[in-house]
Amino acid sequence: MTNNIRLLFGQKVRQIRLSKSNMSQEKLAFECDLHRTYISDIERGTRNVSLDNIEKISKALGVQPKDLLDFTTIGNCEQKK
């Protein structure tokens, strides 16, 4: 379960990042004052992200932190009825 939520979070970050004029991982990392490999780890679902870093990422992407946790709009990951 833990790995699943990390993967979903990473997919959401990537989806929003690419929808913002194809923002690169490097540019996002710069805007967040984080390392590019940290962003890469997040997007691959291998990094556990702190609330502080979720806030930094959401600000850099111009979204609310809750938007990064809304997994209903990722590919096949729709809420089950």
From Swiss-Prot:
SMART domains: HTH_XRE (SM00530). GO terms for molecular function: DNA binding; DNA-binding transcription factor activity. It comes from the Bacteria. May help modulate methylase (M) and restriction enzyme (R) expression as cells undergo physiological changes such as sporulation or transformation. GO terms for cellular component: cytosol. The keyword Transcription regulation applies. InterPro entries: Bact_TransReg_Diox, Cro/C1-type_HTH, Lambda_DNA-bd_dom_sf. Pfam families: HTH_3. Keywords: DNA-binding, Restriction system, Transcription, Transcription regulation. GO terms for biological process: DNA restriction-modification system. Residues 13-68 form the HTH cro/C1-type domain. Residues 25-44 bind DNA. The keyword Metal-binding does not apply. This is Control protein C.BamHI.
